C-alpha cells in the first residue's frame, strides 16, 4: 500500500509543528502517522487515496460516523450561517443543557466548556472550592486530560509529576491509587479523609485498555466520599453518551456521582466539554458562587447545534442498538480469533468500545467474557485479566507498535494510535466492516 504522500506530509510537518503533530498521541504510529484527507460512513481516506475501516472515530466523538445525517448537517450549517460567535448566551445552549439534564439524572445544572481537559480542570477546582479541601484521589492509569492536578504518577506514599514543567508541590495534593483496589482507597481515606476534596474516576479505565470495574468497587468509592464529605466526580468524557446510551455509564452501573465531566460525543465532532452535577455543588461556580470559571468559546453555537442534533438523532433512531450490536459482534469474533491464535490475549470492551490487550498469561476467554472481560470472579482466567492500569501497561509490547498495527493498516483497518486507547464503533459502520476487521485480526495474529 502506497503511503508516500503521508510520509512527505509528515516530513513537512516536522518543520513547522512540534513533533509534526498537534496532539502527542498522533505521533505514535510507526514509522509515521497516516494523514487523513476525508471520511465517509465508517471509513477514512488518507492523503494517498487509500481507504481504511476507521475504528479510531476521532478518538471517540463520532458516534454517528463520518457521514452526518441530514438533520445534523443542516443544524450545523444553519448555526454557522447565523454568525460564528456572539459572546452572549444563545437559545441552543439552553436546549442542549435541557437535553442532557433530562437524560442524565445526576445532572441538575450544567456548564459547557471547550474540551474534556477543561472540564476536568474546572471540576477539580469546583470540588476544592465547594469542600474547602485540597487533595484529590485519582486512579493509576486513569486519564483526565493534560492538566497539572492529574498528571501525577506513583502511589499514595511516593508520588510525583508525570510530566516535566509541573511543580512537585502539585503532586502533594493528588493521591494516585490502583483502580479496583478497594483496600488501597479505603486506607487513603483513613489517612487523609478530612483533606480529600474529591475522587476523580472514570467508570471504566477507557484510556488504558478498557479496564472494567470489579463488583462493588464504584459502590465503595460512593460510600467513602459520602462518609467523608468528599465529592465523587465521574469522568465520562469518553463513556458519556456511549456506554449506557443516553443515560451514560452511570446509568449502566447504577451510581449517582456528585459531579460528571463530559466531552467528545456531546459536541458532535466539534470541540467541547461540560461539567454537570448537583445544584448545590454547581452553584459554587461564578457568577452564583466563588469558583471562577469562564471561556470565550464556551457554549459555541455551532458546537451546541452539532451536539444536540447528534444526541436527538440517537434518541429518535436505532443508533445505540446498531453500534452496541456491532460492538458485541466484534468482541465475540475477536475472542474466537484470540482463543485460536493467541489465547493469552484479552478482549475487552463494552457497548460500542473494543480492544485486544496483549496480556501474557491465562487461558482463552470463555463464557461471559466472550463479549469482553467483565471481571467475573467465576471466570477461570479471572486472575489473568487486567484489573489496573499497571496490568495493561505490563501488556505493552513492541510487537503491537511495530508489527501488529502496521499489518492491520496494510489490510485496510485503522486502529488506535497506541495500544492503550480504546477503539470505537459508529453508526456508519457495517456488518461487512466487522467481518473484514475480524479476518484482518485473524491474519495478523
From Swiss-Prot:
GO CC term (a single one): cytoplasm
Organism taxonomic ancestry: Archaea, Methanobacteriati, Methanobacteriota, Stenosarchaea group, Halobacteria
Protein's UniProt name: Glutamate-1-semialdehyde 2,1-aminomutase
PROSITE patterns reported for this sequence: AA_TRANSFER_CLASS_3
Any single GO BP term: protoporphyrinogen IX biosynthetic process
Keyword Cytoplasm recorded: yes
Record pathway: Porphyrin-containing compound metabolism; protoporphyrin-IX biosynthesis; 5-aminolevulinate from L-glutamyl-tRNA(Glu): step 2/2
Alphabetized Gene3D superfamilies for the sequence: Aspartate Aminotransferase, domain 1, Type I PLP-dependent aspartate aminotransferase-like (Major domain)
Organism of this sequence: Halobacterium salinarum (strain ATCC 700922 / JCM 11081 / NRC-1) (Halobacterium halobium)
Enzyme nomenclature, EC number: 5.4.3.8
Gene of this entry: hemL
InterPro entries assigned: 4pyrrol_synth_GluAld_NH2Trfase, Aminotrans_3, Aminotrans_3_PPA_site, PyrdxlP-dep_Trfase, PyrdxlP-dep_Trfase_major, PyrdxlP-dep_Trfase_small
Main location: cytoplasm
PANTHER family: GLUTAMATE-1-SEMIALDEHYDE 2,1-AMINOMUTASE (PTHR43713), GLUTAMATE-1-SEMIALDEHYDE 2,1-AMINOMUTASE 1, CHLOROPLASTIC-RELATED (PTHR43713:SF3)
Record field: transmembrane: none
Annotated family: Belongs to the class-III pyridoxal-phosphate-dependent aminotransferase family. HemL subfamily.
Amino acid at each position: 500500500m502506497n503511503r508516500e504522500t503521508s510520509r512527505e506530509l509528515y516530513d513537512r510537518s516536522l518543520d513547522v509543528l512540534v513533533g509534526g503533530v498537534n496532539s502527542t498521541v498522533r505521533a505514535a504510529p510507526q514509522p509515521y502517522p497516516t494523514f487523513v484527507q476525508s471520511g465517509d460512513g465508517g471509513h477514512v481516506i488518507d492523503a494517498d487515496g487509500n481507504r481504511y475501516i476507521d475504528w479510531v472515530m476521532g478518538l471517540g466523538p463520532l458516534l454517528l460516523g463520518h457521514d452526518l445525517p441530514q438533520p445534523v448537517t443542516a443544524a450545523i450549517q444553519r448555526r454557522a450561517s447565523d454568525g460564528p460567535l456572539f459572546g452572549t448566551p444563545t437559545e441552543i445552549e439552553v436546549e442542549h443543557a435541557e437535553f442532557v439534564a433530562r437524560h442524565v439524572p445526576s445532572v441538575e445544572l450544567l456548564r459547557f466548556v471547550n474540551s474534556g481537559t477543561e472540564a476536568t480542570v474546572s471540576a477539580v477546582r469546583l470540588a476544592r472550592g465547594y469542600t474547602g479541601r485540597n487533595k484529590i484521589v485519582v486512579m493509576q492509569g486513569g486519564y483526565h486530560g493534560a492538566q497539572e492536578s492529574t498528571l501525577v504518577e506513583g502511589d499514595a506514599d511516593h508520588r510525583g509529576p508525570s510530566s516535566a514543567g509541573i511543580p512537585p508541590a502539585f503532586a502533594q495534593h493528588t493521591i494516585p491509587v490502583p483502580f479496583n483496589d478497594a483496600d488501597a482507597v479505603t486506607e487513603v481515606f483513613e489517612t487523609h479523609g478530612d483533606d480529600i476534596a474529591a475522587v476523580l474516576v472514570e467508570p471504566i479505565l477507557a484510556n488504558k485498555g478498557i479496564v472494567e470495574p470489579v463488583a462493588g468497587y464504584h459502590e465503595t468509592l460512593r460510600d467513602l466520599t459520602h462518609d467523608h464529605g468528599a465529592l465523587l466526580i465521574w469522568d465520562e468524557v469518553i463513556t458519556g453518551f456511549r456506554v449506557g446510551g443516553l443515560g451514560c455509564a452511570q446509568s449502566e452501573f447504577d451510581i449517582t456521582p456528585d459531579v460528571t465531566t463530559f466531552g467528545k460525543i456531546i459536541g458532535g465532532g466539534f470541540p467541547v466539554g461540560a461539567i454537570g452535577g448537583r445544584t448545590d455543588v454547581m452553584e459554587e461556580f461564578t457568577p452564583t458562587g466563588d469558583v471562577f470559571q469562564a471561556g470565550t468559546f464556551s457554549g459555541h453555537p455551532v458546537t451546541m447545534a452539532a451536539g444536540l442534533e447528534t444526541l436527538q438523532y440517537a434518541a429518535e433512531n436505532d443508533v445505540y442498538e446498531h453500534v452496541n450490536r456491532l460492538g458485541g459482534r466484534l468482541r465475540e469474533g475477536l475472542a474466537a480469533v484470540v482463543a485460536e491464535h493467541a489465547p493469552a490475549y484479552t478482549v475487552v470492551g463494552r457497548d460500542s468500545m473494543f480492544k485486544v490487550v496483549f496480556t501474557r498469561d491465562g487461558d482463552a476467554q470463555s463464557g461471559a467474557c466472550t463479549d469482553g472481560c467483565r471481571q467475573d470472579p467465576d471466570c477461570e482466567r479471572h486472575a489473568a485479566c487486567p484489573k489496573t492500569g499497571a496490568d495493561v501497561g505490563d501488556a505493552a509490547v513492541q510487537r503491537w507498535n511495530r508489527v501488529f498495527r502496521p499489518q492491520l493498516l496494510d489490510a485496510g483497518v485503522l486502529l488506535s494510535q497506541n495500544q492503550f486507547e480504546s477503539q470505537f464503533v459508529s453508526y456508519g459502520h457495517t456488518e461487512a466492516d466487522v467481518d473484514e476487521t475480524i479476518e484482518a485480526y485473524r491474519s495478523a495474529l
